[in-house]
């Protein structure tokens, strides 16, 4: 989508809600004007976009979300976390407890969209669409609150901080916000999927994320006298090549793994062999056994290559989110909801990006969707944008998904 589109809309909404006649709540006792709601959600998203905040620093974002919820009479839950908002919407009748989650943090990126509502915080941008996620969940919350009396169970809203830091979900779990919850639903915008389309897949959808840093210690020497030292540059070069054989020769070719060295640093001048070289990178996998296999081989290969060149290697390994694996039963119910919302459902290709929503799925069943937003640039790009007509559709999708799980006659798949 061209920047001309975004520049033209300014603060107005010259378009009609795409397919507004199919986004209807007329079967409910409390009908909602979705055209009005759409404009409200676009305004919310633009406010969030102008005032992005980094992981663990989402103080104004937290206050804004609380204000939006309190204005609708939605009950805020207590929390020991400094940022993030958690709330409940309980129906009149008993039933499962379902969580809906959106992440709220931004990235340390200087925005280059040229939008009239671009970030006002220098060097910080919602370049992964978490403003979209937050607005969409607020919209779903408003719809659920309007129809609270008809809910057959309870909805918990998780406005999660620090997803980009990789551990926000674990803090939410430690805070007890998943206690008593039977299933969890989330989504992520996808700029390469058209608006009106949702990607749903059982099993692995996003990769486990591991990060490594290896400091290779040698003995410095004059470049003209290499025999007087132990060259860590040679060792690092050999190690980088050898590490690639883990994927090509150790991992089953029917499985999937990525090992990338993204940084190498060593030496300060042209005629001196340095004492140390540091390499850093990441491993991505979709299977826990493969993840462990790659890690074990990584340490073994690093030790052996270093020893071969009389070097010492110090490895720091950071384990990030596990593979994100969607539950079959829950995903089936969410697929039903997507069809009811008149969305096109596709089977998406798994993404090698990571998502800490996976931590929730280690505790309770759930489903995570890719939601089409039709942008020109991928996540974390300084010109990243979303098509705002997707916001109301995402809200309605989350609303219908929550309702479908609550209304399901197959509650044994959700709760005991």
Curated annotation (Swiss-Prot):
It comes from Bacillus subtilis (strain 168). This is N-acetyl-L-cysteine deacetylase. The keyword Zinc applies. Binds 2 divalent metal cations per subunit. Is most efficient with Zn(2+) and Co(2+), has only a small activity with Ni(2+) and Mn(2+) and no activity with Mg(2+), Fe(3+), and Fe(2+). One of its GO terms (molecular function) is hydrolase activity. Pathway: Amino-acid metabolism. Zn(2+) 1 binds at residues 128, 164, 380. Pfam families: M20_dimer, Peptidase_M20. NCBIfam families: amidohydrolases. Involved in a cysteine salvage pathway from S-alkylcysteine. Catalyzes the last step in this pathway, i.e. the deacetylation of N-acetyl-L-cysteine. This pathway is likely important in the catabolism of alkylated cysteine generated by proteolysis of alkylated glutathione formed in the detoxification of a wide range of electrophiles.
